[in-house]
């Protein structure tokens, strides 16, 4: 079986390898891919892993078992990163990592993140929260749907897609990923249906962001992550679409103006050809890194 490394793993390690302090926070621990490599390569490190997703935490616990006693996994949102770290009687940390992508295993969990299979419209990272993709698709007004698809998906056919969703749900509730993907597919002009990226990709992204309140949480989490860093500490954020990247870029720019950080990546680092070939979903990843001063 081929071992799949987490996205931009070499680049992430290169920034964290000279960290002097003890504590690193993986604010989006997922299945534990980045955490595993950090623990393996930084033997003095104690890692705090945060995730909303119970299933992710189970996978991470299993993955990180060789490093028993050197990590702690906590269920929570990275917007509460400060509260979580302080609850462990830790004031400052040496490194913070955010990987904002949806984990590969989440795409395979039959929770509606993917339109490759017939799945219920769910998309919740935290299974205990009430709002699901089903609620967004079946209860939001046409204007609300158009706004989120346009703003969060940067989808040029947002108005047509919103109208098609509202028309379709008049006949019956839209219950599965395949149903929603087909509605979006049918809206697209035929010449644009055959591209490398499925027509429904941006709409699914938009609905997932809405369900999980992702953009607000990124703003809050990244700012708090910077505040937690000791002098010389490193923050690294991997984003997967322009909305996320813009938020991170603007936060870094503002915190640099306030003389809180030095930006270490003048332009975001992106995967090389080899990594994209081995792991196609990594193609849109962008890594931005800064150091606390």
Swiss-Prot record:
A GO BP entry: rRNA base methylation
Region (Disordered), start-end ranges: 271-293
Highest taxon above the source species: Bacteria
GO cellular component: cytoplasm
Catalyzed reaction equations: cytidine(1402) in 16S rRNA + S-adenosyl-L-methionine = N(4)-methylcytidine(1402) in 16S rRNA + S-adenosyl-L-homocysteine + H(+)
Keyword terms, alphabetized: Cytoplasm, Methyltransferase, rRNA processing, S-adenosyl-L-methionine, Transferase
MF-aspect GO terms: rRNA (cytosine-N4-)-methyltransferase activity
Binding site for S-adenosyl-L-methionine: 32-34, 51, 78, 99, 106
Subcellular location field: Cytoplasm
Main enzyme class: transferase
Enzyme Commission code(s) on record: 2.1.1.199
Stated role: Specifically methylates the N4 position of cytidine in position 1402 (C1402) of 16S rRNA.
Family (UniProt): Belongs to the methyltransferase superfamily. RsmH family.
Protein name: Ribosomal RNA small subunit methyltransferase H
Organism for this UniProt entry: Persephonella marina (strain DSM 14350 / EX-H1)
